[in-house]
Swiss-Prot record:
Gene this protein is translated from: OR5M9
Top-level taxon of the source organism: Eukaryota
Function text: Odorant receptor.
Pfam families: 7tm_4
Protein name: Olfactory receptor 5M9
Length: 310
C-alpha cells in the first residue's frame, strides 16, 4: 500500500466539471480577487500614511487586511489556473504548502478578531487608561501572538496530514487542498486525524469566540450606561462592523470543520469555502470603511493630496 510520500500530485476536481461554466467562474473570481487585493492593500497603505488612523484599532485592522490578502492569495491563483487548465493538478509539495498556509492564516485571523474585540473592550470600558494600556509595544506583542500560534498549530496539523495513507485515489473533491477532502480520500486509520481536526478547530474557535463574546458583552453594558446618545451611537457603529466580520468569519469555518468529512459534507463545504476564501476577504475592507468616519476622511485627504501634487 503506497504511503503519502509516494504521491507526486493530486487532481483538484474544482467547483464544476462543466466547461462552459469554468470560463465564467474564471472571470468572476478573477474580478473578486482583484477587488480583494485592491481593497486590502489599499487599506494597509491608507492606515500607514494617515495620521488620524494611527491608533491600535487601525493597527490591528491593517493586520487583518494583510491576513485577508494572504488567505485569498493562498487559494485563488491556483483555483484560477485550474479553471483554464485541462490537467487541474497540484503537486504533493504544493498541496502540503497550501494546507499549511490555509490552516495557519485561519488561526491567525480568528485570533486577530479576538485581539480586535479586546481592543474595543479596552477603549469602551477603560477610556482613561486606554492610551497607556494599549501602547505600541503592547499592540505589537498582542498581534504577534496570533502569528506565532497560528503558524505553530498549522505545522503540527500539516505534519499529521503528511502521515495520511492513500490507496490510489488521488482526486481531491475540492478547489484547493484542505484536511476534510484529503481525509475523505485517505485510507487506513483516519479517525484519529478526524477527531484531532475537530478538537483543534473546536478548541480554537471556542476560545477565540469566547474572548469576542465576553468583550462585547462588557462593551454593551458600558455603552448602555453612557448618558450621551451620540456616544452610544458611535460605539455601536464601531462595534457593529467588527461584529459583522466576526459573524461571517466564524460561521463558515465552524460549518466546514466541526463535522465529519463525508461526501455530502465536502460538497456542501465547497460552496461554503467559496464564500469563505474569496468573498469574505473582499468584503472586510468595505465593512470596516463604509460606515467609518475616520476612514472616509482619510480617503478624502489622500485623494486631495494626490490631486494637489498633480
Amino acid at each position: 500500500m503506497p504511503n503519502f510520500t509516494d504521491v507526486t500530485e493530486f487532481t483538484l476536481l474544482g467547483l464544476t466539471c462543466r466547461q462552459e461554466l469554468q470560463v465564467l467562474f474564471f472571470v468572476v473570481f478573477l474580478a473578486v480577487y482583484m477587488i480583494t487585493l485592491l481593497g486590502n492593500i489599499g487599506m494597509i497603505i491608507l492606515i500607514s500614511i494617515s495620521p488620524q488612523l494611527q491608533s491600535p484599532m487601525y493597527f490591528f485592522l491593517s493586520h487583518l487586511s494583510f491576513a485577508d490578502v494572504c488567505f485569498s492569495s493562498n487559494v485563488t491563483p491556483k483555483m484560477l489556473e485550474n479553471l483554464l487548465s485541462e490537467t487541474k493538478t497540484i503537486s504533493y509539495v504544493g498541496c502540503l504548502v497550501q494546507c499549511y498556509f490555509f490552516i495557519a492564516v485561519v488561526h491567525v485571523e480568528v485570533y486577530i478578531l479576538a485581539v480586535m474585540a479586546f481592543d474595543r473592550y479596552m477603549a469602551g470600558c477603560n477610556p482613561l487608561l486606554y492610551g497607556s494600556k494599549m501602547s505600541r509595544t503592547v499592540c505589537v506583542r498582542l498581534i504577534s501572538v496570533p502569528y506565532v500560534y497560528g503558524f505553530s498549530v498549522s505545522l503540527i496539523c500539516t505534519l499529521w496530514t503528511y502521515g495520511l495513507y492513500f490507496c490510489g485515489n488521488f482526486e481531491i473533491n475540492h478547489f484547493y487542498c484542505a484536511d476534510p477532502p484529503l481525509i475523505q480520500i485517505a485510507c487506513g486509520r483516519v479517525h484519529i486525524k478526524e477527531i484531532t481536526m475537530i478538537v483543534i478547530a473546536g478548541i480554537n474557535f471556542t476560545y477565540s469566540l469566547s474572548v469576542v463574546l465576553i468583550s462585547y458583552t462588557l462593551i454593551v453594558v458600558a455603552v448602555l450606561r453612557m448618558r450621551s446618545a451620540d456616544g452610544r451611537r458611535k460605539a455601536f457603529s464601531t462595534c457593529g462592523s467588527h461584529l459583522t466580520a466576526v459573524s461571517m468569519f466564524y460561521g463558515t469555518p465552524i460549518f466546514m470543520y466541526l463535522r465529519r468529512p463525508t461526501e455530502e459534507s465536502v460538497e456542501q463545504g465547497k460552496m461554503v469555502a467559496v464564500f469563505y476564501t474569496t468573498v469574505i476577504p473582499m468584503l472586510n475592507p468595505m465593512i470596516y470603511s463604509l460606515r467609518n468616519k475616520d476612514v472616509k476622511e482619510a480617503v478624502n485627504k489622500a485623494i486631495t493630496k494626490t490631486y494637489v501634487r498633480q
